Design a protein with these regions (language model features):
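Nucleotide-sugar donor-binding and catalytic loop/hinge architecture
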Residues: 172-187, 211
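Short N-terminal targeting/anchoring amphipathic segment
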Residues: 50, 54-58, 67-91, 109
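Short Ser/Thr-rich beta->loop micro-motif in glycosyltransferases that lines
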Residues: 248-249, 265-271
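A conserved mid-protein helix/loop that constitutes part of the nucleotide-sugar donor-binding site
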Residues: 186-209, 215, 226-232
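Carbohydrate-associated surface elements
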Residues: 142, 164
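N-terminal strand-loop element at the rim of the active site
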Residues: 1-60
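Active-site donor-binding acidic/aromatic loop of nucleotide-activated sugar
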Residues: 219, 227-230, 241-250, 256
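Nucleotide-sugar donor phosphate/pyrophosphate-binding loop at the beta->alpha transition
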Residues: 91, 95-96, 107-109, 113-128, ...
Length: 272
């Protein structure tokens, strides 16, 4: 069940999987403001919801979202919320509440893909929602540790379930048209969403320092996100226009990894 049946990974869903999607207000949590830009009504409604959320918190809009969504008619063996909520004033998430309030199932599971203590998710309303699940699945040991520091009473419910990776497919993709880097320079690669928590600004400032020491290094950024223009502006201000290359969102980021000298991670927080 998808709030909005869009995104780069839609084509990866096997044909035998039955995809459902909603037409309630929850669909706006599955789209960006840019996604709505071609339909003025959707653009306006999502913008209003996001503004109210920013001013008064997600708890101010959840009753409206829930009233717009009917209870799903099918009773399931298990319902899984695969997206955690973020900070209470971010227009993000809502899947936990959807599963708890609008899905009938024998068991309900919530996945965690964040550092619960650092990303702003540790708040009264999010904590109350997690108490309603039978199991919380954390994607790593560190992710679980952060969560149970916030909610030690749920330690028995919280299990580690690592993310699934298709290693052979990844190796094959890395071998498909590997990106060729110029000789004579150190090529550093970051593959990340260009958002605050990824700390790409720190990488750019570090690059400026290293180049000032006379080291010829280029930073390659694969990904897009809300901070892209801000990061471009920072690169320009530091005189790094030729040293920071924005490759945008790539269907196959692995081909950039094949020949890179260094893979860099500068996240402020992560579910590691």
């Amino acid at each position: 069940y998808l709030f909005a049946p869009i995104g780069a990974y839609m084509h990866d869903i096997p044909p035998q999987v039955h995809v459902l999607s909603c037409d309630s207000l929850f669909r706006y949590l599955g789209t960006s403001q840019k996604d709505c830009s071609t339909h003025w009504r959707d653009y306006f409604i999502r913008g209003i919801l996001a503004c109210v959320c920013k001013l008064f918190g997600r708890k101010a809009i959840l009753p409206l979202l829930l009233r717009s969504q009917e209870q799903l008619q099918t009773h399931y063996d298990c319902a899984i919320s695969y997206l955690h909520n973020g900070a209470p004033h971010r227009f993000y998430g809502g899947v936990n509440e959807f599963v708890l309030k609008r899905v009938s199932a024998e068991r309900k599971i919530a996945f965690l893909h964040c550092d619960y203590m650092q990303c702003g998710a540790n708040c009264e309303e999010n904590n109350a929602a997690y108490k309603g699940f039978d199991t919380i699945a954390a994607c790593s040991r560190g992710c679980r540790s952060a969560f149970i520091r916030a909610m030690p009473e749920l330690a028995e419910k919280c299990r580690i379930v690592p993310n699934f990776h298709q290693y052979e497919k990844i190796r094959a993709l890395a071998a498909q048209a590997p990106y060729c880097y110029a000789d004579g320079q150190l090529h550093v690669l970051m593959v990340a969403r260009l958002a605050h928590e990824k700390g790409v600004d720190r990488a750019i400032r570090a690059l400026g320092y290293v180049r000032a020491q006379g080291i010829s290094v280029v930073l390659h950024l694969v990904g897009n996100g809300p901070k892209e223009q801000e990061l471009r502006t920072l690169s320009h201000a530091l005189g790094l226009d030729d040293a920071v290359l924005f490759h945008g969102d790539q269907a196959n980021p692995y081909r950039f990894m094949r020949n890179a000298d260094l893979l860099l991670i500068t996240y402020y927080h992560e579910a590691a």
